[in-house]
Amino acid sequence: VSNLNIRKVAVLGAGVMGAQIAAHLINARVPVLLFDLPAKEGPKSGIALKAIENLKKLSPAPFGVKDDAQFIQPANYDDDIEKLKECDLVIEAIAERMDWKHDLYKKVSPHIADHAIFATNTSGLSITELSKGFSDELKARFCGVHFFNPPRYMHLVELIPTGTTQPQILDQLETFLTSVVGKGVVRAKDTPNFIANRVGVFSILAVIAEAEKFGLRFDEVDDLTGARLGRAKSATFRTADVVGLDTMAHVIKTMQDNLPDDPFLPLYETPAVLAGLVKNGALGQKSGAGFYKKEGKVIKVLDPKTGTYVDGGGKADELVGRILKRPPAERLKLLRESDNPQAQFLWSIFRDVFHYIGVHLESVADNARDIDLAIRWGFGWNEGPFEGWQTAGWTQVAKWVQEDIDAGKALSKAPLPAWVFEGPVADKGGVHTAEGSWSPASKTFVPRSSLAVYDKQVFRAPLAGETGADPKTYGKTLFETDTLRAWLDDRPGEDDVVIVSFKSKLNTMGA
């Protein structure tokens, strides 16, 4: 069963996410039906038709070739529900309301093919609670498949099973998403906001809290927390504006409502500045104003003290810029010891995230690799948070974090778990090793997935501390120049294709 061939997909819900997922499946040459409610006037599939037209105007472009929009088949639940039987995978992407989703599941269930997989693209609702909208037979073929926005460009897809999901369904979906759709798949537990948003949004909340504590401006913080840290250029507040401040507030509220026993609960209060912006309809980029506002050609930044927009230009101090260029261990030590408020702020946000992932690893993920890859692929960090901790010196950093917790400087009093300080992780100097990545539940280093689809990937996204194949030397080199290397994969049966790797800056071809 594990080689189910997904030949046709239905996407239910022609909103922003549903339509873009459909577009990306078309990019991958997978036939797609895009369903929505029957329109009250005009053509019955008018809602889906309009969504397909809107896709052509979206930026960044959801299609590789704009004219491919014609290949999405618009559909509505009145006329086309029988066509669901033709689909091997159904992805539900309607609004985040449990009752609406359950109503839809009841309506479409009789029309789902016996072999088909049904997956929800929810970002915050419990997959287990959602599964209660299905018969036992369909529950076994149901899971969460969480794409990140915009789905053509974001590498991450989280796969979330329930206690009743058949394991082979997950293998089939992971294989399809990896090989056909070109995604990086991380399997998550059914906990609020799964892995990437749980840790990534905590990181944003920590930045907001520490920026306020140290009296830093939003544009100053963005200069400190973007490319200088090897993270997305849009850094923190610009990212929030792009995502939409209402969406941000919704994700934070999910944590507040569903994590009553979390030791970091006080932080899951929507920050006053964010709540104020949402209340005034300043939702970020889509409404023209958020933390930033474009006035003509000038981008202004919110001054939270006055509530007005002022000229931007806040930057990292020269001293802090110099510290950030130092090697990882020295960098953290200097930030921690400096009196400069920007340096203190940076040490604090590193500490807060290390504290959080240490406390929560066991409850949110199977192992440390899943957290690092989720944050790299879902939030655009060059290195995951556990990698950052490990490369800076695992034991020393752990001591510093615990010292700050004991001194009341951290965002929670929760101590770091025992596995951080003693046993295999302390002995190996971190969570990522040649054997695999640390799983607190099984108390072992868990190796990478052995799914057959990964045999094709000689260089899987490497993590600090692992020992994988080195792309610079792997295989049998045929010839090499300053700008490129031609080589063969010398594994049996793989040695019939010459591979050329570019070594030049931006992969340019020299004359």
Residue ranges and their predicted role:
Residues 2-511:
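N-terminal glycine-rich phosphate-binding loop for ADP-containing cofactors
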